[in-house]
UniProtKB/Swiss-Prot annotation:
Annotated protein name in UniProt: 3-isopropylmalate dehydrogenase
Pathway noted in the entry: Amino-acid biosynthesis; L-leucine biosynthesis; L-leucine from 3-methyl-2-oxobutanoate: step 3/4
Activity modulation: The presence of K(+) or NH4(+) is essential for activity.
Gene Ontology molecular-function annotations: 3-isopropylmalate dehydrogenase activity; magnesium ion binding; NAD binding
Main subcellular location: cytoplasm
Cofactor mode of binding and number, as noted: Binds 1 Mg(2+) or Mn(2+) ion per subunit.
Keyword Oxidoreductase: yes
Family in the record: Belongs to the isocitrate and isopropylmalate dehydrogenases family. LeuB type 1 subfamily.
Catalytic activity: (2R,3S)-3-isopropylmalate + NAD(+) = 4-methyl-2-oxopentanoate + CO2 + NADH
Domain of life: Bacteria
Site (described: Important for catalysis): 140, 190
One GO-annotated biological process of the protein: L-leucine biosynthetic process
NCBIfam families: leuB
Length: 358
């Protein structure tokens, strides 16, 4: 039996998670996965119930699970809370508690939504990128850090640091991912300037010897940012550190022009969390307008990475493609003046497109 912890969160979170749960339940029943799903609170919903964005019971639930599904957290309702108690802190603490060190973000162009991209169709038509970002090190967590005043002048400082074990474990994740794709991996660094990323390049090159079937290349981060716009289809797997990955994964997500379609996975040793990359969209919460496809595709990633159910992951992804082929659209991905369907209807359409009666 596999245990799944489900945190719907805030805003549109409960709606999109409910739609994704429909798909997961249908797959579970058809594939006899034996899943046990348990719901918990995180973010603003947890604040409302317990005055804590991540109650101890929620963290325990997540740590006992084989995988976590998250909807979205945050919203203006909780803006007045002090920073340490904001809904987003619940998400950060959850990631830290689970020791999630690898973030996987696909950026795939759906041919049915080609016109949604801000770039010309010929540039993005074949884009299918996976950004693998290290989550626990780098300048975001390095010490020392702080603000100080010296001789009457304010000074801020941060420390960029990685050790070789941190680099090696994220590199293995990226190379394994590349083996299941087009077998190309581009490691992004700034090795011409930063000693930290010089070590990064050395260790990634060492790890590459374990994966002779994967073609490794290296690229400086400034060039990578340019190439993502100039010729994005050249990339398969992009591997990079925390700060560079933070920036490049957001850039890559915009290539698609449809943030409501993009899932993500955060992986640790034996634990993982799956969530859409979009926010809680409180302006449309409770109106059956949200696009659940990113969350449904996050379920597909969970089937692939945590449940050893690759054929079913592919089947969910194919069902999403089939729904788009049928012309079904939520408001965020619909062309002006075309019909739209709601969150519930889109979830039901994906379940139907699984063709489980075949």
């Amino acid at each position: 039996m596999k245990k799944i912890a489900i945190f719907a969160g805030d805003g549109i979170g409960p709606e999109i998670v409910a739609a994704a749960r429909q798909v997961l339940d249908a797959v579970d029943q058809a594939a006899h996965l034996g899943l046990r799903c348990t719901e918990g609170l995180v973010g603003g919903a947890a604040l409302d119930a317990s005055d804590d964005p991540l109650p101890a019971a929620s963290l325990q639930l997540a740590m006992a699970a084989d995988a976590v599904i998250l909807g979205a957290v945050g919203g203006p309702r909780w803006d007045a809370y002090p920073p340490a108690k904001r809904p987003e802190q619940g998400l950060l603490r959850l990631r830290k508690g689970l020791d999630l060190y690898a973030n996987l973000r696909p950026a795939q162009i759906f041919p049915q939504l080609l016109d949604a991209s801000p770039l010309r169709p010929e540039l993005v038509r074949d884009v299918d990128i996976l950004v693998v970002r290290e989550l626990t090190g780098d300048i975001y967590f390095g010490q020392p850090r702080g603000l100080e005043v010296i001789d009457g002048k304010r000074r801020g400082f941060n420390t960029m640091v990685y050790d070789e074990d941190e680099i090696r474990r994220i590199a293995h994740v990226a190379f394994r991912a590349a083996q299941g794709r087009r077998k190309q991996l581009c490691s992004v660094d700034k090795a011409n300037v930063l000693e930290t990323t010089r070590l990064w390049r050395e260790v990634v090159t060492e790890v590459a010897r374990d994966y002779p079937d994967v073609r490794l290349s290296h690229m400086y981060v400034d060039n990578a940012a340019m190439q993502l716009i100039r010729a994005p289809a050249q990339f398969d797997v992009l591997l990079t550190g925390n700060m560079f990955g933070d920036i490049l994964s957001d850039e890559a997500s915009q290539l698609t022009g449809s943030i409501g379609m993009l899932p993500s996975a955060s992986l640790g040793e034996g634990r993982a969390m799956y969530e859409p990359i979009h926010g809680s969209a409180p302006d449309i919460a409770g109106q059956d307008k949200a696009n659940p496809l990113a969350t449904i595709l996050s379920v597909a990633m969970m089937l692939r990475h945590s449940l050893n159910a690759e054929p079913w992951a592919q089947r969910v992804e194919a069902a999403v493609q089939r729904v788009l082929d049928q012309g079904l659209r939520t408001a965020d991905i619909a062309a002006p003046g075309t019909p739209v369907i709601g969150t519930k209807a889109m979830g039901a359409a994906v379940v139907n497109a699984l063709n489980l009666k075949d």
